[in-house]
Regions:
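Small beta-barrel nucleic-acid-binding modules, primarily SNase/OB-fold domains
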Residues: 2-14, 19-181
């Protein structure tokens, strides 16, 4: 009789864990960010079981290009700023996709939305001066917003647009340092 009771309890606990654990992230294209790789790439948990990630995907933020980590000091600063923006969202973001959903390297391409205040994180990186505009058709849904955000940060001299700002665009830096990529 006791064994039956314990088996039943364990089964109920297992079912509760299974039901409350999102199988395909959270509803409404919401995902937990598990890692920030640099100022424009994160990892999200897309499948989990009882809170443990089973599948993680890399997401490249559409429309922006942040300095590379080896572009001192702006690469590290961009990564730190993206972490700050994600922490304001409790590391849970809504991911919106555009027409092309993956890049040549297999990363997902997405717009990250702060679930708490509704801000577009890609746009905030531009507006705060930690990334440059980097749009490629057909993924241009928010390109007008991004152009205006970069103009605002540039005119205010924020981040990479300040006195000791970025000396080289990230794309140009990658071209001149192919050994790192």
């Amino acid at each position: 009789m006791r064994r039956y009771y314990y088996t039943r309890i364990v089964t109920i606990i297992f079912l509760i864990a299974l039901i409350t654990s999102p199988s395909y992230a959270l509803p409404g294209n919401s995902y937990v960010v598990t890692e920030v790789h640099d100022g424009d790439t994160v990892s999200i948990k897309v499948k989990s079981f009882a809170g443990f990630p089973l599948k993680v995907e890399h997401v490249r933020l559409i429309g922006i290009d942040a300095p590379e980590l080896r572009q001192d000091p702006w690469g590290r600063k961009a990564k730190k700023h993206l972490k700050k923006l994600l922490s304001e969202s409790d590391w849970v973001v809504n991911v919106e996709f555009d027409i092309d959903q993956r890049d040549k390297g297999g990363r997902l391409l997405g717009y990250l939305w702060n679930r708490r205040n509704g801000s577009l994180i890609n746009e905030k990186m531009l507006e705060d001066g930690y990334a440059v505009l980097y749009t490629f058709p057909p993924n241009v849904k928010y390109s007008e917003r991004f152009i205006e955000a970069e103009k605002r940060s540039h005119s205010r001299g924020l981040g990479i647009w300040g006195n000791k700002g970025l000396t080289q665009y990230p794309a140009q830096w990658r071209k001149e340092h192919p050994a790192y990529y």
